[in-house]
């Protein structure tokens, strides 16, 4: 399932879930501050880095001669690693008392993973690169969200996270657009093999990944926290409120049916190849994915503001229903061998809407 970004970034256990954690009243905390802005900029740069890979990865696998099924296996294993990391990252941060340092490590691992992918000549390095990147994403996400949560009031969390996810997705729009454009330009140059243009784009994508680390280091402030070396993971999990455990169960059930949206790109490419040819089909599929990210960035802030008024739960239910609809529509597209760009665009729009709900509200 997607971690784009896209992915279940829950707050640090002790700092966010225990009612004893102090929260300033709404009158003393505005939702737009240096921490929210810095976290948003950092996420935008991080998304620029790895979403560029997402949009060209299916084509990269094709020129390397790696079967399409390998993409599903690689993404599935990487998502599993990210999910496990998210579960324990809050515990580790509370035990050590260093949230910001761990977030910086997480952001550093994204460009490191990109380097492995750029060097890959087969599936092992691709898998290693994805594992490193998604481990970093799983490590940083919950802790970054916990920092943002403590920087705003409870009454404005929806708006803060809606803004954060919107800025985050701007990077996810610009990155793939530039990636597709640079890929088209690079193909006109002389390369030793067909993978050369793809490697060139992957190397360029490392730059915003490094800038993300510097932005978080310079802009985001996190109060010092006392380490808790006696904290135990399983006793902490057992002590979580029953309502939160039920929420985690629901999120986990949805996660079992969720899937990486790299597979949407791959599926659209396969469906359109018969009518457009593989190169043009891959370009159109990449643009459809950019459209999905545009839908997400446009919808994120309004969804967060709406959740502040009516509550997050009803909108999360709608978002999960849209996620199920997206999967059903893609299955039907393959069942009927749909090669219609407008119909496939509808699938990507539904995907953008449900990810906007998921990303903006799950952490609040």
Predicted segment positions?
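Helix-to-loop junctions at the C-terminal end of transmembrane segments
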Residues: 85-98, 183, 298-312
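Cytoplasmic membrane-interface "Motif A"-like loop-to-helix N-cap segments
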Residues: 95-107, 309-321
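Intracellular juxtamembrane helix-capping segments at the cytosolic ends
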Residues: 139-152, 357-364
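Transmembrane alpha-helix termini and helix-breaking/packing motifs in multi-pass membrane transporters
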Residues: 59-63, 174-196, 267-271
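C-terminal membrane-cytosol helix-exit motif in multi-pass small-molecule transporters
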Residues: 206-226
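Helix-loop boundary and gating motifs at the non-cytosolic
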Residues: 25-82, 245-288
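Residue-level signature of mid-helix packing/kink "hotspots" within the transmembrane helices
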Residues: 51, 79-87, 172-173, 293-301
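C-terminal ends and interior cores of transmembrane alpha-helices
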Residues: 108-121, 321-338
């Amino acid at each position: 399932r997607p971690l784009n970004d896209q992915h279940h970034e829950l707050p640090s256990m002790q700092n966010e879930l225990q009612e004893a954690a102090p929260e300033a009243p709404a009158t003393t905390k505005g939702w737009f501050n240096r921490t929210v802005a810095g976290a948003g900029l950092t996420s935008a740069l991080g998304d620029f880095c790895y979403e560029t890979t997402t949009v060209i990865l299916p084509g990269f696998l094709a020129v390397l001669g790696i079967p399409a099924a390998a993409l599903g296996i690689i993404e599935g294993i990487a998502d599993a690693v990210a999910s496990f990391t998210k579960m324990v990252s809050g515990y580790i941060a509370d035990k050590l008392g260093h949230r910001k340092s761990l977030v910086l490590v997480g952001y550093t691992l994204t460009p490191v993973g990109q380097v492995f992918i750029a060097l890959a000549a087969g599936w092992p390095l691709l898998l290693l690169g994805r594992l490193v990147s998604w481990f970093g994403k799983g490590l940083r996400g919950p802790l970054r969200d916990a920092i943002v949560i403590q920087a705003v009031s409870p009454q404005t969390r929806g708006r803060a996270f809606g803004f954060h996810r919107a800025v985050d997705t701007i990077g996810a729009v610009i990155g793939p657009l530039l990636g597709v454009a640079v890929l088209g330009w690079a193909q006109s140059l002389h390369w030793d093999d067909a993978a050369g243009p793809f490697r060139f784009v992957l190397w360029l994508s490392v730059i915003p990944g490094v800038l993300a680390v510097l932005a978080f280091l310079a802009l985001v402030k996190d109060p010092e926290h006392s380490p808790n070396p006696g904290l135990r993971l399983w006793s902490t999990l057992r002590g979580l409120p029953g309502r939160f455990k039920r929420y985690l169960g629901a999120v986990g059930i949805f996660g079992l049916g969720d899937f990486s949206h790299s597979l949407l790109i791959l599926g659209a490419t396969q469906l359109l190849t018969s009518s457009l040819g593989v190169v043009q089909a891959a370009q159109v599929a990449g643009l459809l994915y950019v459209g999905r990210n545009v839908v997400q960035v446009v919808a994120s802030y309004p969804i967060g503001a709406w959740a502040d008024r009516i509550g997050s739960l009803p909108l999360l239910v709608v978002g999960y229903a849209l996620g199920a609809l997206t999967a059903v529509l893609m299955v039907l597209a393959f069942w009927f061998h749909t090669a219609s760009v407008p119909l496939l665009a509808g699938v990507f729009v539904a995907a953008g809407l449900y990810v906007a709900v998921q990303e903006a509200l799950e952490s609040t």
